[in-house]
Amino acid sequence: NQLNPHFLLNTLNNIYALIAFNSDKAQEAVQELSKLLRHVLYDNQQTFVPLEKELDFIRNYVALMRIRLPQQVEVSVNLEVDSGGALQIAPLIFISLIENAFKHGISPTVDSFISISIFGHTDGTVRCEILNSNHPKSGQDKSGSGVGLEQVSKRLELIYPGHYEWIKGISENGQVYSSILTIQTKSL
């Protein structure tokens, strides 16, 4: 239930570099990081948080990740709740999926994309769909150990046993990785 420590260190380094050429943007980034850390440190202690609050966390996370992205990476984010704010979700349940997209979906040399869509419906269904470019790591790179996704599976089984569906995989042409997680929150 935590953020990758490398994310925090990279973000601080990016903010440090940003100070030299755009202090206003650096101040914004510090505020976004502060909101993000507040959520991780305090809201994470609860079993469930309002979906809207979790979506705000994801917006802050993506805003911080965009600071370090090369120009050729297109990021689209669509986060909506049509439940009137009543939906509750386990905190940070989606963050490993999103981190994965930023970690494995970006190439420094080839155009890349990340698409993040999360919808909360009045029937209690929350659907998270993440699509990203598939840039397989080399054989020597052990950064893709799968531990993050394994942790997500364990948390889903613990919190939402029998009330979720998670479909993930690589497209036939090998170009796109998709992760589609649907959780039925009202049946708990």
What are the residue ranges of the model-derived segments?
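Two-component histidine phosphotransfer core
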Residues: 1-171, 176-182
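Short, charged/polar, Gly/Pro-enriched secondary-structure boundary elements
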Residues: 185-188
